[in-house]
Amino acid sequence: MQTKNQFSRIIIFIAFALGLRFLIVGRVLENTEVWWLQATAIILIFYIGIGYVFRGTAKVIEETTDVLKNRTKLAGGFLQAFGTAFPDMVIGVVAALISLQVRNTDYVRAINLAIIAASTTFGSNIYNILHAVWCIYRQNLANIKHQTVLMFPFFKSAGSLKPLGEHNVKPSIKEMDGAIRVLTALTLLTAFVAISMVLFGQVKNEKIAGDLYQLIMPVGIVLFILCVSVLYYFRKSHRPQSQVKEIIEEERYYDQQGSWRIWLDLALSGIAILFTEESMVKTMEIFSHLTHIPFVVTGIVAGLIGCFGEMMVVHNFSINPKGRIGDAIVGVAMDNIVTTMGAAIVAIIGGIFLGSNSLILIFIIILTANTLLIEQISKLKNSLQNIK
């Protein structure tokens, strides 16, 4: 990214995001029944959203958070999460609000929307963690082989990872310990949600076939308080200030800007991500109606869309060895805690529901993924300790 006209580029990202949401989705996709026109619009939305907006905003988040964490002493992953996770949270809240609006007139549709809200929120947690597991696994593989490995085999364009010994700036042991602790907290929060839904949230309604479970309001309030407490506790950075000589050209640009300007760019990047994700979620809803895909599947796919921004940031931190792998890991865990906080907000307004099968599968996968990531971080920590 060029060091000039950074603000202009971010405005362009927002313009594209708004164009996707209100022009392509609002004027074309939602107002046509022509299948080839709908297919073209869907392809265009995903191509521009992922290929341009997400990639561009991920770079901005990477550049701004490294400077901000030095100035504020907040963890880079904490700042990163607030740039990428709030759009996920807002999408879940919006789905829940729509669910509440139609609950008295169309209960089945209200429950389906609430299921989308839940599966979007927790589905994004699954993808975030599994993607981070893969990134750290590939880094550990590079460390074991003592050679550069591709992020994805056979795909050079996705970047590569160098052994830690070849990194000019390395993550600290303290960062790895902090990441493990944040992930442990996330695991406990996830288990709390699952257990609470099973013990206190069973819903029986003759209009709904099968078992249904709700994250009830009192549990939502407790969960919200716990999430805020965890975010506050782990807000501080465990990494030394970035070395000036290692700050890339774009970050040097931000290093010369006022803090208000950096916060503004970070916030605007989040807005661009929000509108792009909303466009993609609406696209998936239309696609679901066309193909008769179940709503819970649509919600889980929407969760993947919702976490693309975070995944791009983690990917960039992994293939660009500037000592920010620790920030990437903490950012993933913080991102998931923020989206869990979003689930708490949705529960407070009354809109988190899951069927028994999806409830079991989603939470088992999240807990398993958390365990795998903790294992990979432990291996990465051992590699750091063995570097001379």
Can you name each region flagged by the protein language model?
Residues 1-388:
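Hydrophobic alpha-helical segments, chiefly the membrane-spanning helices
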